[in-house]
């Protein structure tokens, strides 16, 4: 009976307080909050936070130093000022630049020699283009409906442009003649183009108006003679023999009405018997006859001639 001592009953709530809870860190409330059920509005806020946060540990977004840009500072005071010389020259066209250069050389003559030695030598193509521009201006000023021989009215209309072209021819031609021009091919090429321009000069009903045209033919003929003589001294005139200048000069002489006959005679004397048959007045019956020089080059010289047999 002693062993069966009745133990007083213990209330259940005493057992709950008697349990020892483990030590909890300061992050336990955060963990408990993360284990609770999430609401829909909480998910949206978390996505925004994650997207806005920059991944500092991601290797794809390595921060790079930006280059230092030196921004041009604006001027504190804006005021008008003239253009610099390089900018001013950029705005000038060819005619304006030529006028400025001529005015400066006239005021300071010592600069003229400097410009002449600094500027490049004019080429045949550029010079002939200048002459063609003068020729085009002359032709466009001729009244419409004019025939082959123009009237005095047309002459008064175009005489200023005619004089400009003749003066340009007279100035440019000596530049391409020896001894100023040492290459014979350059001189001949210029004379060929300049003679074509003279062929295009208008003809006038009044004879005195044709004096300028006749004088141009006379000057260009003397230039041909000078260049032919100089070419004959170099290499036995090989430039004249293989350049076809005998045919070209013969055609120019025919177009001019025989005004270049002196040049034709000089070329005939320079070439001798090798090119004589291609020149007018040297026994050639027509323009289709092949010259002796061409026959020698092609190997057909002497074909069709009787061969003499027996003692000479």
From Swiss-Prot:
GO terms for biological process: nuclear protein quality control by the ubiquitin-proteasome system; proteasome localization; protein transport. Residues 1-83 are annotated as: Disordered. Gene3D superfamilies: Tethering factor for nuclear proteasome Cut8/Sts1 (1.20.58.1590). It is found in: Cytoplasm; Nucleus. The keyword Disulfide bond does not apply. Residues 20-34 have a biased composition (Polar residues). Keywords: Cytoplasm, Nucleus, Protein transport, Transport. GO terms for molecular function: proteasome binding. One of its GO terms (cellular component) is cytoplasm. Involved in ubiquitin-mediated protein degradation. Regulatory factor in the ubiquitin/proteasome pathway that controls the turnover of proteasome substrates. Targets proteasomes to the nucleus and facilitates the degradation of nuclear proteins. Belongs to the cut8/STS1 family. Binds the proteasome. This is Tethering factor for nuclear proteasome sts1. It comes from Talaromyces marneffei (strain ATCC 18224 / CBS 334.59 / QM 7333). The lineage of its organism: Eukaryota, Fungi, Dikarya, Ascomycota, Pezizomycotina.
């Amino acid at each position: 009976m002693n062993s069966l001592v009745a133990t007083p009953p213990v209330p259940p709530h005493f057992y709950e307080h008697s349990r020892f809870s483990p030590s909890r860190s300061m992050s336990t409330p955060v963990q408990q909050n993360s284990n609770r059920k999430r609401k829909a509005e909480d998910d949206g806020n978390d996505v925004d936070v994650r997207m806005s946060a920059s991944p500092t540990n991601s290797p794809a977004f390595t921060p790079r130093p930006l280059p230092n840009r030196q921004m041009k500072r604006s001027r504190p005071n804006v005021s008008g000022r003239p253009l610099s010389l390089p900018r001013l020259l950029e705005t000038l066209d060819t005619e304006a630049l030529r006028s400025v250069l001529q005015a400066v050389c006239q005021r300071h003559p010592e600069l003229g020699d400097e410009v002449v030695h600094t500027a490049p030598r004019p080429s045949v193509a550029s010079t002939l283009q200048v002459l063609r521009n003068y020729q085009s201006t002359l032709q466009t000023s001729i009244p419409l409906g004019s025939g082959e021989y123009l009237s005095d009215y047309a002459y008064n209309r175009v005489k200023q442009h005619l004089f400009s072209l003749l003066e340009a021819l007279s100035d440019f031609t000596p530049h391409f003649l020896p001894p100023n021009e040492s290459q014979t091919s350059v001189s001949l090429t210029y004379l060929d183009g300049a003679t074509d321009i003279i062929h295009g000069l208008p003809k006038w009903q009044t004879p005195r108006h044709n004096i300028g045209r006749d004088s141009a033919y006379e000057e260009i003929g003397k230039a041909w003679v000078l260049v032919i003589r100089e070419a004959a001294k170099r290499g036995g005139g090989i430039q004249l023999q293989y350049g076809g200048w005998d045919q070209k000069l013969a055609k120019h002489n025919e177009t001019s009405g025989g005004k270049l006959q002196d040049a034709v005679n000089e070329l005939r004397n320079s070439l001798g018997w090798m090119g004589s048959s291609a020149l007018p007045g040297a026994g050639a019956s027509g323009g289709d006859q092949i010259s002796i020089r061409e026959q020698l080059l092609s190997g057909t010289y002497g074909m069709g001639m009787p061969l003499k047999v027996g003692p000479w």
